[in-house]
Each structure stands twice: as C-alpha cells, then as structure tokens.
C-alpha cells in the first residue's frame, strides 16, 4: 500500500515520494554520497549524525542488512532518500530488509525521488537543511521545520555519538593506543586490534593527564560528525600531548590536528561523501582511491607559516587529504583508511602509527 512521504528543503522545494521505514519526522542537512554499495555502513557511520543521507546510486536495499556491517551500535543518519527501494533483498548474510532496519531505529525513508536531479541541485547550490516526513504533516509546517532547525555548525554532534565511559580492548597486548572518540567507526578499532594492539577508547572530553594514566604508546584522534571548532577539548589534547606521543588523526581528527597547530577550517560547499575519491601522495606520487565522509576541510592557505605541511591532495578539487608535522610524529588523513564502506587501498597507514 502506497504511503506518501515528503521532503522539504530550506529553499522552499517540496519533494514527494513513497514512505518506508519509521512513521516520523526528522530534520537534518541533506547530503549525497557516491558509491554503488555500502548503505548499511553509511547509515551506521557516526559521521552522518545530523544529516539526511542520499546515495546517488539508484537502487538501494537489494542485499539487505546484517549487523556484521554496522559501523556503530545503530543508525546515526537522520533519514534516507532513494530513487528505488528493493522490496526483496538477496544475500546469504541478510537478516532484515532496509525498511525494517530504518523502522527499528525510528528513521524515516523516502523512495521514488529523482536523486540525480537532487544531487545536481546540491552540487550547484550546496548542502541544504531539510525535513523528511513519513507521517501526515502540512507542507508549510514541514518547510518551517526545515528552515528553522539549527545549523550543523551550532550543534555539538560529537557529544551525541562518543562513548560516555572508557572502553578497554585487548588489555594484555604489548602496545597500546588511546582513541579520543569523536565518533569512531568499528572498522578503525578493528584495524588496530588486527595489529594486536591494546585499544582504550575514551570520550573526547578526557583530559591529557587521564589519557597518560593509560600509559599509551600512541594516540588516535577519530573521525566524527559536525564542526571541528566545537570539539575544543580534543584540540587542547593534541596541543598538550603532541610532544609526548605519536598522534594520528582520521577525517575530523585531521581537522582537529590542523586547528591545534594554528591552521583554519572551512565548511565545504557539498563535501566529500562516497567510496571513490582519488588522493595523491605528494611525496611518492602514488594515487589511491579512498572512502570519504566530511563536510569541512583544512584551508590550505592557512597552513603556510605553521609547523604542519600538506602531504596529500584530492585530485578532484585540490583540497588537503593529508597533513604532517614537520618535526613531531603527528600526522593525519582526511579520508577513511579503514574503509567501511569502500576500498582498502590505504589501510596500511595504521602501520605507520605503530612504526612511530
């Protein structure tokens, strides 16, 4: 039975389609992600908190859902926009359908949308605030919700997705990495555990002294959602520990490291989200295909005169994809070397943290 869903954008556009998932209304920043697969990993990626996700590939849900692919403890995106929803998934590991998955976590979905046209609109005008309704609501009321919601730069999204208490894994390992959790993905944790490292995951508000009590051999500043300037505690941690520990940053972690050493960050027009972003290493000349999910990036001009340098660039738009301190063992990447979803071209970068 067809049930209408509506998506309102802050520019006044109302898009109608077929509802699936939970019967509710959600607001968020409407973003698109490129890639033919990976909807489970993307929906459960904490970096999508505060955002309504639109995959550009037209068919979604065709291989179902299994918890094995989760990148956190559940869906973190606010909603899902698709061209076509597959009603009968086929995969040996599938435990539930995509609509059932969304309903389980109270998330609305809309199908039958011209996602190509909406992607072009966002590409040309930039990301927009939106409101997605799968329950009855007046168009004007829905549009008002889209327009009046706080900007993503005004919300402490990291606080919504980080751990509340420290988590210790593989405690008896000979080496130990502390993860400053801003929205860590499971694949990042697994990448460290596969190196037989001990892992301690702490809230981003944990003080430098408390971190050092764990006697770590290295520090990982994790990926996560939102505006890095709001994660002041993590910035201060990098400043305090950069001369005492090797530090590695992923995605939001790169932005936090850049801010700690005096560079600036800016919000991108529509960001990088997907599994096919080409990145060039400026030292080796090699090019890797990477998985990315970020709406902020380092201002390359602001790096001049600081103690950090740009080591990798995005080949699509020239934005910084890697930075490194000129003297200290501090480095970072803007992409996701752990994949989940996406290619594993750069997963060996975790080895470098241990080499330090």
UniProtKB/Swiss-Prot annotation:
Pathway annotation from the record: Amino-acid biosynthesis; L-arginine biosynthesis; carbamoyl phosphate from bicarbonate: step 1/1; Pyrimidine metabolism; UMP biosynthesis via de novo pathway; (S)-dihydroorotate from bicarbonate: step 1/3
Keyword tags: Amino-acid biosynthesis, Arginine biosynthesis, ATP-binding, Glutamine amidotransferase, Ligase, Nucleotide-binding, Pyrimidine biosynthesis
Binding positions (L-glutamine): 47, 224, 226, 252, 255, 293, 295-296
Domain of life of the source: Archaea
InterPro entries: Anth_synth/Amidotransfase (IPR050472), CarbamoylP_synth_ssu (IPR006274), CarbamoylP_synth_ssu_N (IPR002474), CarbP_synth_ssu_N_sf (IPR036480), Class_I_gatase-like (IPR029062), CPSase_GATase1 (IPR035686), GATASE (IPR017926)
Region of interest: CPSase: 1-176
Molecular-function annotations in GO: ATP binding; carbamoyl-phosphate synthase (glutamine-hydrolyzing) activity; glutaminase activity
Annotated EC: 6.3.5.5
Glutamine amidotransferase type-1 domain segment(s): 176-356
SMART domains tied to this protein: CPSase_sm_chain (SM01097)
Pfam families xref list: CPSase_sm_chain, GATase
Biological process annotations from GO: 'de novo' pyrimidine nucleobase biosynthetic process; 'de novo' UMP biosynthetic process; glutamine metabolic process; L-arginine biosynthetic process
Subunit composition and interactions: Composed of two chains; the small (or glutamine) chain promotes the hydrolysis of glutamine to ammonia, which is used by the large (or ammonia) chain to synthesize carbamoyl phosphate. Tetramer of heterodimers (alpha,beta)4.
Family: Belongs to the CarA family.
Role played: Small subunit of the glutamine-dependent carbamoyl phosphate synthetase (CPSase). CPSase catalyzes the formation of carbamoyl phosphate from the ammonia moiety of glutamine, carbonate, and phosphate donated by ATP, constituting the first step of 2 biosynthetic pathways, one leading to arginine and/or urea and the other to pyrimidine nucleotides. The small subunit (glutamine amidotransferase) binds and cleaves glutamine to supply the large subunit with the substrate ammonia.
Family matches, as HAMAP family: CPSase_S_chain
Name of protein: Carbamoyl phosphate synthase small chain
